[in-house]
Amino acid sequence: MESLSHLVKSTLPNYLSNLPVPDTLGGWFKLSFKDWLALIPPTVVVAGIGYTGYLAFCPAAQDRCSAKKNSGRCNNLIRKHEAKVVDMIDVEDIAEKAAFCRCWKTKNWPYCDGSHGEHNKQTGDNVGPVVVKK
């Protein structure tokens, strides 16, 4: 307990008082490289605390990290009332070739409308259509 007391009462205040924080805006431009290096650790600590607070209290961050969103589900909107989405397409009905969606983002189900391009940009995925040729 004495080590924690020593850290809070003397070590941390001495460290913070010795940081090269300038009094004026122009003083920031006069800092040396060594001074900038000395400011990196407390900046990282403050940024980490801020980011942790953001994840803990921001609703958008909570939604993004929740298990609901990251459940591994592919289909979020097409024919949700069915237990399994199956489409039968007769090869005889295909003129020359047809592109079928695999990303579940299309508005023209089951045909691909290129929605996977935006999906790939947002997620870093590389999904594309299934192309069937006659």
Swiss-Prot record:
Gene3D superfamilies the record matches: CDGSH iron-sulfur domain, mitoNEET-type (3.40.5.90)
Residue ranges of the TM segments: 36-58
Principal subcellular localization: endoplasmic reticulum
GO BP terms in the entry: regulation of autophagy
GO cellular component: endoplasmic reticulum membrane; mitochondrial outer membrane
Molecular function, one GO term: metal ion binding
Cofactor binding: number and manner: Binds 1 [2Fe-2S] cluster.
Cell compartments where the protein resides: Endoplasmic reticulum membrane
A Pfam family matched in the record: MitoNEET_N
Lumenal side: 1-35
UniProt keywords, alphabetically: 2Fe-2S, Endoplasmic reticulum, Iron, Iron-sulfur, Membrane, Metal-binding, Transmembrane, Transmembrane helix
Cofactor(s) needed by this chain: [2Fe-2S] cluster
Membrane topology annotation: Single-pass membrane protein
Family classification: Belongs to the CISD protein family. CISD2 subfamily.
PANTHER family (alphabetical): CDGSH IRON-SULFUR DOMAIN-CONTAINING PROTEIN 1 (PTHR13680:SF5)
Protein name: CDGSH iron-sulfur domain-containing protein 2 homolog
Name of the gene encoding the protein in the UniProt record: Cisd2
